């Protein structure tokens, strides 16, 4: 659901760029100014600026900002190591942690009146899912070679006609389940908030749903990251 955001529209209009909530053309520049892309740039800028200003110079005795980031980053690092092993966690921490922070903020930004969540677009969630899906196959092939794909045909040759279609459907279903789960939940939150804002004003009536929206936003980010970790660990262990 696309809410009008005046200051972004004004800035882009003054720069001669397509307004994100107006008609969007077919050129590359116009595509980059579509609503979900505009808010993606906004989320990325927010994460960069917040980390820059809250961290500053790292100190031996950390301040409040450094303590906050050490808690978040340290917690994710321990979780990844417990579920994937230390070596694999170190290798994929930048990617998965970036996904976690991006998805959490992208989900939450839609709770601000006049903003929308980039993850309320299937384009965003499918792009994230494709990266995860492709990476977990790369991990499996790198760890086990062609033997990684033997689980698609089952342990016995006579089971191939049965196991191959089942395994292929199951594997490609991950693309749908991971992307549509995130998209569907966040889109439902956006639609419900939009209806309540329109019917009951900007503050009191939507407040309970906004509180629930915070929980949904964080839980969906956690679910996406958890499943990513599980897929990567399975690919490494060759256990499906």
Curated annotation (Swiss-Prot):
Any one Gene Ontology molecular-function term assigned to this protein's record: proton-transporting ATP synthase activity, rotational mechanism
Family matches, as Gene3D superfamilies: ATP synthase, F0 complex, subunit A
Cellular location(s): Cell inner membrane
Keywords associated with the record: ATP synthesis, Cell inner membrane, Cell membrane, CF(0), Hydrogen ion transport, Ion transport, Membrane, Transmembrane, Transmembrane helix, Transport
Membrane topology: Multi-pass membrane protein
Any Gene Ontology CC annotation: plasma membrane
Coiled coil ranges: none
GO biological process: proton motive force-driven plasma membrane ATP synthesis
InterPro entries: ATP_syn_F0_a_bact/chloroplast (IPR045082), ATP_synth_F0_asu (IPR000568), ATP_synth_F0_asu_AS (IPR023011), F0_ATP_A_sf (IPR035908)
A Pfam family reported for this protein in Swiss-Prot or TrEMBL: ATP-synt_A
Sequence intervals crossing the membrane: 41-61, 92-112, 121-141, 152-172, 191-211, 212-232
Keyword Methyltransferase part of the UniProt annotation: no
Subunit structure: F-type ATPases have 2 components, CF(1) - the catalytic core - and CF(0) - the membrane proton channel. CF(1) has five subunits: alpha(3), beta(3), gamma(1), delta(1), epsilon(1). CF(0) has three main subunits: a(1), b(2) and c(9-12). The alpha and beta chains form an alternating ring which encloses part of the gamma chain. CF(1) is attached to CF(0) by a central stalk formed by the gamma and epsilon chains, while a peripheral stalk is formed by the delta and b chains.
Family indicated by similarity: Belongs to the ATPase A chain family.
Function field: Key component of the proton channel; it plays a direct role in the translocation of protons across the membrane.
Protein's UniProt name: ATP synthase subunit a
The organism of origin for this protein: Desulfotalea psychrophila (strain LSv54 / DSM 12343)
Underlying gene: atpB
